[in-house]
Regions:
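Membrane-embedded transmembrane alpha-helical bundles that form the catalytic cores
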Residues: 2-504
Length: 505
């Protein structure tokens, strides 16, 4: 974290001192420096991705520009694209799945008395590989689809893939969203830099006051879930989800704020997710950039595939009903949620997590006509306040259960935690890692975050509102959040410096 801010401060200072034409080079040098310091000997992996994607995109562009035979060109381009995508997916799949797969096979061999052993390797994931790989693949597919023109300059492609504010945890950006901003150079604007700094402070508030504090209780209970029940299990379910939100959205605030200090606008990744009224809406508000990527490059790829369209077309002619109408969507959603689970890692709980949301969302789509008939029969207004409140509460239950599956470490631990909520437990909730005072600080922090989310949900731009106030009032807000971070940030003593959760993916 310290290295990140040192690089950021130096980069901002130098960025605005040199010519506009060369400012993108400052971003590249800062990004490469940061990545090399943090990832050290794993840096060649991102270099391989950048080189392979740059070469393939250049080849596709050259074929499009020079060849008159459209059919042959498309076939060659598709082959080149698929080989490059397979190379990059192969790298991440090997690094993520080799060790768990080897361990699984070795355990099977042992049980059947098969005299063989797959060597175990201590593999470490390169920094941000899950994020920059998706950006690279998205860029390549967009060039293939002729949505964008391939960038000729390798170093500009490298900057797009390794821009240091977003390399750790995203947000995952499409080339046409950020490339021009990265390359063009921006004039100094006090408001833009100040707004960026404010966004960073808000991210630090979420991370240091809420996420890292909740971690103490989460770790205490999740390390030995079978020893706890009742309120302890319930707090684990609630606090892990809130910790994940504060941690992940906190980093995104830092990333977006850091980019904003250069005049660069990254895509938002969260939009008040806990105000959603359905699981589908939740995923339109949570980890938005991943959802957009999966929709653009997995959902539409499957839904518009000739084989699926042909099969569903024949089925619709024989059986004209609601299910056959939505079947292409359901098949596409299955692959989207499978990819979502696999993207997070090789654990079964990640795959079940993806399938959990697939079942929830697809069930809602399948049963939609039934719900409409039920509302009509019972004379219930589906847009009424009572139904709206019910949907909101139902969605919160779905979210908390889903995130428990996600964060439990194993399906066994997830089941133990969820099934223990209604069992008696005689301990005190203040013996779970947070004493009374720390618990109160955590709750106040959570209330502050959700108050801000509520205000934003009402359409109020908080930063603009603060900026319109008189100077003393503005600085009172800024100083208050700085003092809060300094006084109540979770560092020193019983706290340790914690990495961002999604940095592990």
């Amino acid at each position: 974290m310290l290295i990140f801010f040192i690089v950021l401060i130096c980069a901002v200072a130098i960025y605005y001192l040199i010519s506009l034409r060369y400012r993108w080079i400052v971003l590249l040098v800062a990004s490469v420096t940061f990545y090399a310091i943090i990832s050290t000997y794993l840096t060649p992996f991102i270099c391989l991705t950048a080189v392979s994607v740059w070469l393939c995109a250049a080849y596709i562009q050259r074929q499009n520009d020079s060849s008159a035979d459209v059919k042959t060109t498309k076939k060659k381009n598709k082959t080149a694209m698929l080989l490059t995508i397979l190379l990059n997916i192969g790298i991440i799949a090997f690094l993520k799945f080799y060790s768990p797969f080897a361990a699984l096979l070795n355990s099977v061999f042992e049980k059947v008395n098969f005299d063989a052993q797959i060597p175990s390797l201590k593999l470490i994931l390169p920094l941000g590989i899950s994020f920059y790989t998706l950006q690279a693949i998205g860029y390549l597919i967009d060039v293939y689809r002729k949505k964008i023109i391939a960038e000729k300059n390798f170093f500009k492609v490298a900057l797009f893939l390794c821009f240091f504010p977003q390399i750790l945890e995203g947000p995952i950006a499409k080339y046409d969203q950020t490339a021009a901003q990265l390359y063009e150079g921006h004039k100094f604007d006090y408001k833009t830099v100040a707004f960026g700094a404010q966004r960073i402070l808000w991210g630090l508030f979420k991370k240091m006051i809420v996420a890292d504090r909740l971690y103490l209780l989460v770790k205490t209970v999740s390390d030995k879930p079978s020893e706890y029940a009742g309120i302890a299990s319930l707090l684990l379910i609630l606090f892990y989800t809130l910790q994940l939100y504060a941690d992940f959205s906190g980093f995104i605030d830092i990333a977006i704020g850091s980019a904003e200090m250069f005049g660069i606008k990254l895509p938002e990744n969260f939009r008040q997710p806990f105000f959603a009224k359905s699981a589908q809406e939740f995923w339109q508000r949570w980890h938005i950039s991943l959802g957009v990527w999966l929709k653009e490059y997995v959902f539409y790829t499957v839904a518009l595939s000739p084989r699926l369209m042909k099969f569903c077309g024949k089925l619709k002619k024989k059986h004209k009903n609601h299910f056959t109408k939505i079947l292409p969507t359901l098949v596409s959603l299955f692959f989207v949620w499978l990819c979502n689970g696999l993207w997070h890692g090789a654990k079964w709980n990640y795959i079940v997590y993806g399938m959990y949301y697939f079942v929830i969302i697809s069930s809602g789509m399948i049963c939609e006509p039934l719900f409409k008939k039920l509302y009509a029969a019972m004379k219930i207004n589906p847009d009424g306040k009572a139904i709206s409140i019910f949907r909101h509460i139902r969605t919160l239950f779905i979210i908390f259960i889903g995130e428990t599956i996600f964060g439990a470490g194993s399906l066994k631990n997830a089941w133990i935690t969820l099934s223990s909520v209604f069992k008696p437990w005689k301990g005190s909730m203040f013996s779970l890692g947070l004493d009374y005072k720390e618990f109160i600080v955590a709750i106040i922090g959570i209330i502050t975050i959700f108050t801000a989310d509520f205000i934003k949900e009402k359409g109020v731009n908080i930063r603009e509102s603060i900026a319109m106030k008189k100077l003393p009032a503005r600085w009172l807000c800024y100083i208050s959040i700085i003092v809060a971070i300094v006084l109540f940030g979770a560092y020193g003593g019983m706290y340790s410096l914690l990495p961002f959760i999604y940095g592990n993916f």
